[in-house]
Amino acid sequence: MVVCLFSACNDDDDDKIPQGPAITYAGKLPSRIGDYTFVYDDNNRCTQVKNNSYVYGEIDYDKGVVIMDDEEAKVSFNSDGYVTGISASWNYNEDGYSYKGSGKISFSYNGNGQLVSYTESSSESGKEDGESFSSQGSYKATYTWKDGNLIKVVTKEESTEDEEKYEYGSTCTIEYGEEKNELGQYTLGQAKVLDMEDADVFALGKASAYFPVSYTEEYYEKDSEQNYENEYSENMTYVLNTDKTIKTEYINGSPYSYSYVAIDNDSDNLKVRSLLPSDKKNLNLRSFFIRHHGRK
């Protein structure tokens, strides 16, 4: 997940106990989409996202924290159960390398429960190979909706390390077909546009009203050595189950299968999915917060 199992409290959420989204599609929860596996608690809330054995993070709703590699970030939700932000700090010192920093992320939604903005800021200082460094970074994404569909995403990333500046920006446009998304299910393609796989379990607001069939991303990056521009596009098609859930999504012709677990309050199915492989790997807080830094 370029995870967004996280959230930092805003003023409106200070007195609320984190609940988290518990959304089902035709009485089922997505258990696997492509290489991503989703783990749920007894209240049908997603507690973990994995990519094969790689664990992006685990959420403790009772404590209101996300746990990444035994570290905690505070988490909260708005009244609809959608993630509203993240804040955390880190301090590592090992084998001559040291990193001390902090980061904050916030999400906002419109009155229809659709994600409209994502902002991120972080700063860090430390030593690598005996050399000191300091860096700051910011990232902002804005989302434009029309007729219930996400049609455009604009991002801008800026970072500075020891006075050297880096900038990255992109504009992504999304096209839709005539097939209605009757269950309001997030697709893998749309989650990729958001750069956050948590969208697949409804943690980031409502999905588009129709199934997206393509997106085109124009992007640039520049620093002291380059000024680069390029374009990238993907096409999506779908095969649905009889209950209108997605069975297979094809992205540029490659199939991504969807698996589900039926909701049964008397079953241990959801608990069983919480078991982790012995070779699991974890994303730490620092890796998550500096992923938008243009560090070399």
For every predicted segment, state its role.
Residues 5-8:
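C-terminal motif of bacterial Sec signal peptides marking the signal peptidase cleavage site
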Residues 11-296:
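Buried hydrophobic residues that stabilize the cores of well-folded domains
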